[in-house]
Amino acid sequence: PGLEMHRVTGVVDVGDEDFRIVVEAQSQVPRVYIEFTVVNAGEEVWMTDFLTGNWREVPPTASPLDFSNLGGTMIDIIYAVESPELLGVESVSGIETRRIRGTIQSEELAGLVPGAGGGVDIDVDLWVEVHQSLVYQMVLAGQVLSTDKPDTERLLLLGEFDLPVVIDPPE
């Protein structure tokens, strides 16, 4: 509450379930743009204080997004899609994908968006790579969190699979 996320970028080590993300957001009062970083390394989660830039250890629930089990979470989301409809084949970043549209219950997104509320239909579009069935893009439209506006959209872009990454806790 009080923050509106505009962009999240980062890297995920699916094998170790570690991630590093940079969150760009805007506070509501006063209207100030802020940026902070979240690192999940092993059992520890660290976040920069957006005022001082200093690192501090935080509980996992403090992260606005949870990529610690991204592979499993994406599978859970795909299986939870209701009334899936194939819209056709589209290119995403030069990759041939199948675009699938359906709905999902907001609580099914709790693995990705901590605090996701229950009982709200969320529209979901998935762009799934034709040959390996990797999700390259996902759009979630609707009120996932109780603090979201009803027309909130979340765009998740995935790519550069199988590249080595090293995610260490901050020093």
Where are the model-predicted features located?
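N-terminal leader/targeting segments and the immediate start of mature chains
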Residues: P1-R20, G88-E90, P164-E171
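Solvent-exposed loop/turn segments connecting transmembrane beta-strands
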Residues: G2-E4, V29-V32, S146-D148
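Short small/polar-residue motifs
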Residues: E4-T9, Y33-E35, I77-G88, D123
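Extended lipid/amphipathic-ligand handling interfaces
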Residues: R7-D16, F36-V45, V124-V130, L156-L163
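An acidic-aromatic
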Residues: V11-G72
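A mature extracytoplasmic/lumenal domain signature
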Residues: V23-S27, G42, D49-L51, E90, ...
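Flexible, processing/modification-adjacent segments and terminal tails
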Residues: M47-A116
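Gly/Pro-enriched, hydrophobic low-complexity segments
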Residues: E96-E171
